[in-house]
Curated annotation (Swiss-Prot):
A molecular-function term among this protein's GO annotations: proline-tRNA ligase activity
Catalytic activity entry: tRNA(Pro) + L-proline + ATP = L-prolyl-tRNA(Pro) + AMP + diphosphate
Record-annotated disulphide pairs: none
Subunit structure: Homodimer.
Name under which the protein is recorded: Proline--tRNA ligase 2
Main location: cytoplasm
Gene: proS2
Family: Belongs to the class-II aminoacyl-tRNA synthetase family. ProS type 3 subfamily.
PROSITE patterns the UniProt entry points to: AA_TRNA_LIGASE_II (PS50862)
Single biological process term from Gene Ontology: prolyl-tRNA aminoacylation
First-tier enzyme category under EC: ligase
InterPro entries linked: aa-tRNA-synt_IIb, aa-tRNA-synth_II, aa-tRNA-synth_II/BPL/LPL, Anticodon-bd, Anticodon-bd_dom_sf, Pro-tRNA-ligase_IIa, Pro-tRNA-ligase_IIa_arc-type, Pro-tRNA_ligase_II_C
Length: 476
């Protein structure tokens, strides 16, 4: 049975999309629901999200943000107040038209995002500069009626956090926007072991209604980019539309400066596609629901289960640990926990007990070592950190190996046709060139990185003077 289970995973080299689907199903992260595009987060998948949420929530509270909750319904008239915003989301909006059998006087939108609700609220509670800043965060689900869906990456309903803040000055709102982007980047790198590129979105790719959008981009196993998190500076675009004013220090009315930012369960899709392999899920230790699994060998023999339980009591002081004392074979268990991506497996049987040791196996490298039982409390935390570093370094090496430089149109064509990954190239800043590259090569601008490189004098597309180096790529 174990063999059949492993063989059920399609190899990523053969069909990456099917490989991904196999993993999310076989690792019991999600199940499909009866509503197209909606997923059921199973206990293991939800525990993974909870661990991510816990870290993020603590970091936001440490920086002065407060959690709130807004309604899930938005009146159509409220959504219409910011023109660019509503146009950007209109195709994805789900509408409620009836309450019971009664037709509603006004359609209600099921929130695709909550800017308009926060704006309405802010306009009621802010009068003076003494009321600023307001630093709010919301954990909720949102609905976007997507045409093509895939678990975690693009679903009709998904879980996320969305932050909304208002400030006295443009400088404060810009600082907030970039501070949050840095928080997201450090979370990805320090907890998910995913290396990211920080940068600004082009006008074409920025959030509907924003003055500027900043992003963290990561590279998946198949060479496609994933926008892992975004932070938006709205300037006064929304505050003018919603009349969010305050009396400044000179007694004059001013519009607030506003930000919005968010990350979602899409991050789980990212960590699957960055770290996992043809044997199943590989989880970064810091967010893994279970960090260590103990598999008793010949558990029917006297003393084996007792010793496994004793080890669990010691290890749970330093890691999230479970014992599998079920009557399934050790081979089945090995494959099961390999599939679920548990970072460390410990095997303990009669011979190990005699030698006062355990067999320790790493999920990421399959390396095996013998560890004295009295050293486990020390060895396990150190090894979990080693695994995190190894996963990060491996992902960064992959990204670097699959990042290419193009200095002219023909070079870009050759790379786009033959390779998968990021393409660094210069750009003049014109929308026409951005759209032509998308049309010709299927690549979009991922970001204008903060760390700029001067690769050439001319735009990759039109030959005019270049203004920015841009990361281009095919993306989810």
């Amino acid at each position: 049975m174990a063999k059949e289970q492993v063989q059920a995973i399609t190899k990523m080299e053969e069909d990456f999309a099917q490989w991904y689907t196999d993993i999310v199903k076989k690792a019991e992260l999600v199940d499909y629901s009866s509503v197209k595009g909606c997923m059921i987060l199973r206990p293991y998948g939800y525990a993974l999200w909870e661990n991510m949420q816990k870290v993020m929530d603590e970091k936001l509270k440490e920086t002065g943000h407060e959690n709130v909750y807004m309604p899930m319904f938005i009146p159509e008239s409220l959504l219409q107040k910011e023109k660019d915003h509503v146009e950007g989301f209109a195709p994805e909006v789900a509408w409620v038209t009836h309450g019971g059998d009664e037709k509603l006087a006004e359609r209600l939108c099921v929130r695709p995002t909550s800017e308009t609700l926060f704006c309405e609220h802010f306009s009621k509670i802010v009068q003076s500069y003494n009321d600023l800043p307001k630093l709010y965060n919301q954990w909720c689900s949102v609905v976007r009626w997507e045409k093509t869906t895939r678990p975690f990456l693009r679903t009709t309903e998904f879980l996320w956090q969305e932050g909304h803040t208002i400030h006295e000055t443009a400088e404060e709102s810009q600082a907030e926007t970039l501070n949050i982007l840095n928080l997201y980047a450090s979370f990805c790198e320090d907890y998910l072991a995913i290396p990211v590129i920080k940068g600004q979105k082009t006008e074409k790719e920025k959030f509907a209604g924003a003055k500027a959008t900043y992003t963290i981009e990561s590279l998946m196993h198949d060479g496609k980019a994933l926008q892992t998190g975004t932070s938006h500076n709205f300037g006064t675009n929304f505050s003018e539309a919603f009349d969010i004013k305050f009396l400044d220090r000179n007694g004059k009315w001013q519009y607030v400066h506003q930000t919005s930012w968010g990350v979602s369960t899409r991050m789980i899709g990212g960590l699957i596609m960055v770290h996992s392999d043809n044997n199943g899920l590989v989880l970064p230790p810091k967010v893994a629901p279970v960090q260590v699994v103990i598999v008793p060998i010949a558990q029917h023999k006297e003393g084996v289960l007792a010793k496994a339980t004793e080890l669990q009591a010691h290890i749970q002081k330093v890691a999230r640990v479970k014992i599998d004392a079920s009557n399934k074979t050790p081979g089945w268990k090995f494959n099961e926990y390999e599939m679920k991506g548990i970072p460390i497996r410990l095997e303990v049987g009669p011979k190990d007990i005699e030698k006062n040791q355990v067999v320790l196996v790493r999920r990421d490298t399959k390396e095996k070592e013998f560890v004295p039982m009295d050293q486990l409390e020390e060895r396990i935390p150190a090894l979990l950190e080693e695994i995190h570093i190894a996963l990060f370094n491996k992902a960064k090496a992959f990204r670097d190996e699959n990042t290419y430089v193009a200095t002219n149109f023909e070079e870009m064509k050759k790379i786009a046709d033959e390779k998968q990954g990021f393409i660094k190239a210069m750009w003049c800043g014109e929308l026409a060139c951005e759209e032509k590259l998308k049309e010709e090569f299927g690549v979009s601008s991922r970001c204008m990185p903060f760390e700029q490189e001067h690769l050439a004098e001319e735009c990759i597309c039109c030959g005019k003077e270049a203004k920015q180096m841009v990361y281009w790529g095919k993306a989810y």
